[in-house]
Amino acid sequence: SYTPYQTEVSQGRLEALMNFQTAVCDLTGMPLANCSLLDEATAAAEAVSMMYALRPRDMQKSGANVVFVDESIFPQTLAVMTTRAIPQGIQIRTGKYSELELTPDIFACILQYPNASGNAEDYRAFVEKAHAANCKVAVAADILSLALLTPPGEWGADIAVSYTHLRAHETSAHL
């Protein structure tokens, strides 16, 4: 009987990850995918850190440090983002995305798709408004729903995160 060498096992894992990332890109409408974060909440917190690091120079100089989080996000995602934001000096502001006035201190927005109430909101106009204010937009999306819903990448999201089961514990963040 044949026992596979470690390199062949590693190659098989790499191929599985590549196929998984390709499927994630197709579902999210994003050009790149990663598959090594723990859960959606952690991936969302990483998205906040990434968007904070990517602030334009004028936002950095002005001290823009607020991320807007739509109130319909899952509570565990909000809790992890808040915990991770505090040591970085990032403030979390929650509210209704439809009522948000984008002030100069807001550098990014996070949306849930579908939201915690199960509604699949049409965020296109909001994303355009955020981009016009030089804000990045991240979306925490249900990956299975994206087989039927319009992917976040198609309506302009900069980052999409999701909880997926590659091996019962791995998730993905997408840029």
Please provide the spans of the model-predicted regions.
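Short glycine/serine/threonine-rich phosphate/pyrophosphate-binding segments
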Residues: 42-47, 119-120, 146-147
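Active-site phosphate-binding strand-loop segment of PLP-dependent enzymes
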Residues: 93-145
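Glycine-enriched alpha-helix->loop->beta-strand junction motifs that scaffold or abut catalytic
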Residues: 156-159
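Anion (oxyanion) recognition and catalysis
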Residues: 86, 131, 153
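Aromatic/hydrophobic pocket-lining residues that form π-stacking "cages" and hydrophobic walls in ligand
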Residues: 81, 126, 164
